[in-house]
Regions:
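N-terminal export and membrane-targeting signals
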Residues: 1-14
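Active-site beta->alpha N-cap acidic-glycine motif
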Residues: 68-188, 195-199, 217-221, 225-261, ...
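Short aromatic-enriched loop/helix-cap "lid" or pocket-rim segments at secondary-structure transitions
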Residues: 147-150, 202, 259-262, 284, ...
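Alpha-helical scaffold elements lining the catalytic groove of polysaccharide deacetylases
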Residues: 117, 195-233, 283-348, 368
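N-terminal low-complexity, Pro/Thr-rich disordered segments
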Residues: 18-91
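C-terminal domain-boundary segment and adjacent tail
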Residues: 81, 135, 270-283, 337-424
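Short, hinge-like loop/turn segments at secondary-structure boundaries
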Residues: 152-155, 208, 406
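Glycine-enriched alpha-helix->loop->beta-strand junction motifs that scaffold or abut catalytic
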Residues: 186, 264-271, 285-288
Length: 424
């Protein structure tokens, strides 16, 4: 173990396991403060057991069990609304005997700010062009103007204090537009919580009650953005956040133990705050689906790297977010090929879902954004592949036979079983 720039790096055997840093991407008001990325825990070293924006064109797919009376209701101060079931949601279907599971991929984004680089809107387009849907983990305070900082009461910190910068007024407006459009396109709006505190007095030190406070504030910033911003000219978000929010990812992946206890009281269905694991089928942690980032093979080495942009950055340019431009193209290909290696391993093997996490950032000339885009374009239209949200994956897992899922969890990532004998 060694510490570099406040980041703990652990090297064990053939796998380089980096502390995962779920920071907030670049883009004007979304810039992070210096030192906002302290260390996180490593994955287990044990091997796996062997007028609102109009909806996009196309049919509206809804859960038939979700009833709606057809009436749009404005909620609270007009920040949100109830417009019925979310459009473009696939109906989860139980595997038939002998059926091979779909190959699921989940692309998720921490922070979800529409900054000057307009990456939120860009990746919405990438998703639409490739039959994909994505999860956007919103930092709640990105809807809170700095002038209203006193509304933010972070656990163990002063009122209004943040480890990241407040968004500009224009970025708040732009982010609201993106959230509205993303939900109507079938994307998921999850949470990255609020102040992005890590390390001492961060999420890892918070009690269950403090996590509950953080979660309540996550709801409040979305449900009261009109009051907080004074933007009366904008339409409400087309969803009831109390009903839609199903999970999130904690900053720096810290504090999952107490977070899960708090999340359960809100009825959340999954959590993506695990510090990492192998590519195996998910399991539940105290009734909540655990969706960790995963170790994927790094080309030309025996190492595996966790499936998030910062981990590739560290492998390639260390602490520098802008390394040698001569290396950018090679680094982009290595990052892309790592993700594709992880994909091919399970696509031709266990079919365990692949989770890829990212930020809206421009590190090393934006190569990590391009690598993710390359992967979306390469795999999301392939036979048997479904690029979905975490919420949609939870829907699918919930209708499967628990005994079949238990057998699938025993598979090594590259192990291709006899599906006819496994799925009964």
């Amino acid at each position: 173990m060694r510490t570099v720039g406040g980041v703990v790096v652990l090297v064990t055997g053939t796998a380089l396991m980096l502390g995962l840093l779920s920071g907030c991407g670049s883009g004007g008001g979304g810039a992070r403060k210096r030192g906002a990325f302290p260390p996180s825990a490593r994955p287990s070293s044990a091997p796996p057991s062997v007028s609102p924006t109009p909806a996009p064109s196309g049919a509206k797919t809804v859960n038939p069990e979700e009833k709606w009376d057809g009436k749009v209701r404005i909620l609270g101060d007009g920040s949100t609304s109830s417009t019925g079931p979310q459009p473009h949601q696939p109906k989860p279907v139980k595997l038939k005997p002998g059926e091979k599971p779909p190959q699921f991929l989940v692309f998720s984004w921490d922070g979800a700010l529409q900054g000057d680089d307009e990456q939120f809107s860009h990746f919405r387009e990438v998703a639409k062009e490739n039959n994909a849907q994505m999860t956007f983990f919103l930092t709640g305070t990105y809807l809170l103007p700095k002038s209203m900082a006193s509304k933010c009461r972070p656990p163990q910190h002063k009122r209004g204090e943040m480890a990241i910068l407040y968004a500009t007024d224009q970025h708040i407006r732009d982010t609201l537009e993106q959230l509205r459009g993303a939900w109507l396109e079938g994307d998921e709006i999850g949470t990255h919580f609020n102040g992005h505190f890590c390390g001492a007095k961060g999420g890892g030190d918070w009690s269950v009650a403090e996590w509950k406070s953080e979660i309540e504030q996550s709801y409040s910033f979305v449900e009261n953005w009109k009051t907080n911003t004074g933007y009366k000219d904008l339409p409400p978000l087309p969803f009831d956040y109390r009903k839609e929010l199903a999970g999130g990812r904690a900053p720096c992946l810290e504090g999952q133990k107490n977070l899960l206890k708090a999340a359960k009281s809100f009825g959340w269905r999954y959590d993506a705050s695990s510090p990492g694991d192998f590519q195996i089928w998910p399991s539940k942690n105290d009734g909540i689906w655990n969706f960790p980032l995963q170790l994927v093979p790094y080309p030309g080495t025996e190492r595996q790297v966790l499936s998030m942009d910062f981990n590739f950055l560290y492998n390639q340019s260390g602490e520098r977010t802008q390394g040698d431009p001569v290396e950018y193209e090679q680094w982009r290909k290595l990052t892309r090929d790592s993700y594709l290696n992880g994909f091919e391993r399970v696509y031709n093997g266990s079919r365990a879902p692949l989770f890829i996490g990212n930020h809206f950032e421009d590190w090393n000339g934006g190569i990590y954004m391009k690598a993710v885009e390359d992967v979306v374009e390469s795999v999301c239209k392939r036979d048997g592949v479904r690029c979905v949200t975490f919420k949609q994956l939870a829907d699918w897992l919930d209708v499967q036979d628990p005994q079949v899922l238990a057998k699938m969890r025993q598979l090594d990532p590259a192990q291709s079983p006899d599906w006819k004998s496994l799925v009964k």
